Amino acid sequence: MPSTVKKQPRNAAAKKSAKSSVVPDMLDANVSVETNAQLIARRDLAVPRGVASTAPIYAKYAENAELWDVEGNRYIDFVGSIGVLNTGHRHPKVIAAAKAQEDQYTHTSFQVVPYGPYIDLAEKLNALAPGDTPKKTLLVTTGAEAVENAVKIARAATGRPGVIAFTGGYHGRTLLTLGMTGKISPYKKDVGPFPSDIFRAPFPSPRDGITVEDAITGLKNLFLTDAQPERVAAIIIEPVLGEGGYTPVPFEMMHQLREICDKHGIMLIADEVQAGFGRTGKWFAIEHSGVVPDLITVAKSMAGGYPLAGVIG
């Protein structure tokens, strides 16, 4: 039977669907708002170019997996603030918890006047982390801060300076974590020199033709040429490579890293800042391999959109 529905031109249909049929109250109010173009012009005068933005729109409201800009256009948010919103925008439980806390106090500095929720979260993270050994958790603010503290912990525990990271890895944008990050553009360009005692091994990548055997051989060659294993404090790796191509570490690779670390007294750090908290179907991506790291760094989706990070181990 022929359709009785009149078809719209593709462009017209796309424009119509971009406008929300259920506009949130705050967008439906009869108030004057700036356009995306006006905000872009203001931004160009007030914000450094180094703070890049991908989308030429400005957010006004968000709910679950959807976002509305200041002009009322509705979008599906596939980015989730780069892995920060595994629970979606404005999850009711997250909002309720934040409001309840605001009614009590906002900050006391745990080092000055400690508070119970810090301990509550530490206990939960200790219980969730893989492995049967007792654990403790340090809480900080950002993923880069968590990674830096993991390095400090490894250096203090082993008395060694060296850190081995992998090609394509991303660990943050502070000076130390940039030194560990395995790509130049856009973060490392023209901002060196970087800290010493940071070494890089090849990441096993089918896309780049690098096998697990190649990667392990590269790591062992590094021990022979640049990084004396007795002076290496930690090997850090993302169980799922993030900015380097979203490539999972082969389980065989992870097991061999564990064996190498055990042999040389090196701490294995799993950087779960992007991959953690359910993004791979388990609390932590490294759980799929069955390998237990010495330290786990966490951030992003742990707090459902609020700045919170930690080191578990």
Task: Outline where the language-model segments fall.
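Conserved N-terminal phosphate-binding loop of PLP-dependent enzymes in the Aspartate aminotransferase
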Residues: 2, 6, 15-313
